[in-house]
Each structure stands twice: as C-alpha cells, then as structure tokens.
C-alpha cells in the first residue's frame, strides 16, 4: 500500500516531546522483497549448500532403510515421490510456493526425463544397498567425468589439464576404495566369497547408476532450457510422473507375499522403518528442488561435483551411524577423493577467470542434437 504522507509529517519538534510522552513514530514503509528473493534464488553458493545438506540427509535415511533386509526398492521410491507431491501441494495451497498446473502436453514432453530419474534413483538405491556410504560416495565421482565430457559434446564445454588431473585423482580414489573394501571383506571373519560377491553386485549397480545419473543430469539441463521449467515445475513433474511407473514396477517386479512383507517390516522395527521412509520422502522435496536449483544457477558439472565435495561429511556419517570399515586404505580413499574435489574447484576457477579471446559470436550456436530436441518439442 502506498504511503502518501509528506516528509514533514514524520518530523518531531523537540519541545513538544514532553507534551506527548506516548508518541510513537510511525513504522517505516515496507521494503520491497522481490530483489532479495531474486538474489537468493540465483545465489549459486546457497544452492550448493542446500544441495549438500539435502543429499546428506537423503543418503543417510536411505541407507538406514536399505541396511536391513529391505528389498522393496520401488515401493520405497514410490513413497518418497508420494510424500514429496503431498508436501509441495500443501505448500502451494498455503501460498508458500507456486508452480504450473498439470498439463498433459508438457507431461508427455517431460516423461523421458522422468524415466531417466527413475533409473538413476533405483540403481542408486541398489548400489547403496550393497556398498557402504563412503565407497558409494567415492564411486559417485565417476559420474562427474561422464557429465563433464557430455557437456563438451552438447554444451560447448572444455576440459583443461588441471581438470583432467582432478579426474585422475577421482579414478585413483575409486580404485583405492574398491581395493580397501575387497581387502576388508577377504580378511574379515565369515564367508569371504559371499561378501566379495555382494561387493561385485554393488559395483555393477554403481556403474549403471553413473550412466543413468549422467544421462539424467545432461538431459534435464537440456530439457529445462527448452521448456523453461522453474525449480518447482521440475520437482512437480518429476515426482508426479514417477508415481504410476513406480507403482507398476513394484507390483510386477517385487515380492508382495506376506512372508516378504513381514521380512521387510519386522514388528520390532516397523515404526522406525516407516518413519525413516517418510523422512526420506520429505528429503526428496529438498533434493528435487535443490538439484534443479543448482543445475539452473550453476552447471550440471558443478552440480555433480557437489557430491564429491560432500564425501567427507557423508563418509563420516557412514562411519558414525553404520558399520563401515575404518581402515587406513578406506580413509586414504576418502581423503584422495576430497583432494580431487578441491583440485577440480581450483581448475574451474582458473578456467572461468581465463579471458576468451578470438571468439566473437554473432549468434548462439545450436548443435544438431539441440535443434532436433527443439523440433521434437514443437511436434
């Protein structure tokens, strides 16, 4: 509401203060908040920190559920998506957020990204089920390499020598982590063959997850540019479109016999598991929003690198809350992976600070893949 009072209306004569001891100065006019909200929405550092916290929460909650004999992974993911949809719908009803209403044509165009998301989160849950949190986070670094070269192919990115060196450190840390994991499995008491087989299954799921994650991140970045989706639009369509697919996959591919349900939800831990599932579902609200937010205000490579910089607190959570082996090779792998993240950050800073000479573009270049994507959206 506009304040029409003149400046002299706010003046106070000092000799009249004693006559009106109860005088209260009028409140200052409200300050516009649009610029502040815009600066927060486009703050790259804040988006990275938000993604860090949400990814740590989601990883720990998922590991808690999957660390038992839980094998209803599709059901877990469906609960997460359902809780996410309920949460953002309540926020929209309260006027806290806004996003587009459901549109069938937009849903059809976004559905391939949803399938990539389902592939990413399912393979990630399977890898986390077989691997410890430190090993899982270290191997997640390999996704950064795939995404970086994907950006070279589709978004005109480049890889410097220092960036390439950081990639070498990431691969080296993954090798150390795998060797430490296998060494601990062989030397520990119990069936070593069974433990090594479990680790091998985890490595295979991790490889598939790296491919799915890089495809999802690159595809989502390109699709966001073409559809002009905002952060909550992306979160809404990602979770809403994934629910029917996850329900069908859970009903067809997972065992819903009474014995298996009792094994997944034992009476002693049933309440704790259900609470963790709901909490992990709420964490998907933050991970869905902050991941899209981070990709929008930074780049898909920076988004993937956040996971590498997160490895230290995530690994510590695995060592504190779960039975992850604490050995010199495993700690060394964590530290090498963390150093690789620092080297990568320095490489990106130097690359961004270097002036681009000799390049005078008159138009925005469009690759053949980008043009074909735009043509498909028009159809």
From Swiss-Prot:
Cellular component, GO annotation: cytoplasmic vesicle membrane; endoplasmic reticulum membrane; Golgi apparatus; Golgi membrane
Name this protein carries in UniProt: GDP-mannose transporter 1
Pfam families referenced in this protein's UniProt entry, alphabetically: UAA (PF08449)
InterPro entries xrefs: SCL35B1-4/HUT1 (IPR013657), TPT_transporter (IPR050186)
Membrane topology: Multi-pass membrane protein
Compartment annotation: Golgi apparatus membrane; Cytoplasmic vesicle membrane; Endoplasmic reticulum membrane
Keyword Lipoprotein belongs to the record: no
Region feature Disordered, mapped onto this chain: 17-38
Subunit comment: Homooligomer.
Keyword Metal-binding: no
Function: Involved in the import of GDP-mannose from the cytoplasm into the Golgi lumen.
Cytoplasmic side: 1-39, 91-110, 157-162, 220-233, 294-301, 347-379
One Gene Ontology molecular-function label: antiporter activity
Family: Belongs to the TPT transporter family. SLC35D subfamily.
GO BP term (any one): GDP-mannose transmembrane transport
Transmembrane regions listed in the UniProt entry: 40-60, 70-90, 111-133, 137-156, 163-182, 199-219, 234-254, 273-293, 302-322, 326-346
PANTHER family: SOLUTE CARRIER FAMILY 35 (PTHR11132)
Gene: gmt1
Main location, first listed in the record: Golgi
Keywords linked to the UniProt accession: Cytoplasmic vesicle, Endoplasmic reticulum, Golgi apparatus, Membrane, Sugar transport, Transmembrane, Transmembrane helix, Transport
Stretches in topological domain Lumenal: 61-69, 134-136, 183-198, 255-272, 323-325
């Amino acid at each position: 509401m506009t304040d029409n009072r003149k400046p002299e209306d706010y003046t106070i004569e000092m000799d009249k203060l004693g006559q009106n001891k109860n005088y209260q100065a009028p409140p200052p006019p409200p300050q516009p908040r649009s610029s502040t909200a815009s600066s927060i929405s486009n703050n790259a550092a804040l988006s990275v920190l938000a993604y860090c916290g949400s990814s740590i929460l989601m990883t720990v909650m998922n590991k808690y559920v999957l660390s038992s004999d839980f094998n209803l992974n599709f059901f877990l993911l469906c609960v997460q998506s359902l809780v996410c949809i309920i949460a953002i719908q309540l926020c929209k009803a309260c006027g806290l957020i806004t996003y587009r209403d459901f549109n069938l044509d937009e849903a059809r165009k976004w559905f391939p990204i949803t399938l990539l998301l389902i592939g990413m989160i399912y393979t990630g849950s399977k890898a986390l089920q077989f691997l410890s949190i430190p090993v899982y986070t270290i191997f997640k670094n390999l996704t950064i390499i795939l995404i970086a070269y994907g950006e070279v192919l589709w978004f005109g990115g480049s890889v410097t020598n220092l960036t390439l060196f950081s990639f070498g450190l990431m691969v080296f840390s993954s090798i150390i982590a795998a060797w430490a994991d296998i060494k601990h499995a062989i030397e520990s008491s119990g069936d070593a063959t069974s433990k090594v087989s479990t680790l091998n299954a985890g490595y295979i799921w991790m490889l598939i997850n790296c491919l799915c994650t890089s495809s999802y991140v690159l595809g989502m970045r390109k699709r966001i540019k073409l559809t002009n989706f905002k952060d909550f639009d992306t979160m809404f369509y990602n979770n809403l479109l994934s629910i029917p697919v996850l329900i069908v996959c859970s009903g067809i591919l997972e065992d819903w016999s009474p014995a298996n349900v009792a094994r997944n939800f034992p009476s002693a831990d049933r309440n704790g598991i259900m609470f963790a599932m709901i909490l992990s579902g709420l964490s998907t609200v933050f991970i869905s929003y902050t991941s899209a937010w981070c990709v929008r205000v930074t780049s898909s490579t920076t988004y993937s690198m956040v996971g590498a910089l997160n490895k230290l607190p995530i690994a510590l959570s695995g060592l504190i809350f779960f039975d992850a082996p604490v050995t010199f090779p495993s700690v060394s792998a964590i530290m090498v992976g963390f150093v690789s993240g620092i080297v990568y950050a320095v490489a990106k800073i130097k690359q961004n600070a270097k002036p681009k000479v000799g390049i005078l573009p008159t138009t925005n270049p469009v690759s053949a893949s980008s043009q074909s994507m735009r043509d498909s959206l028009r159809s």
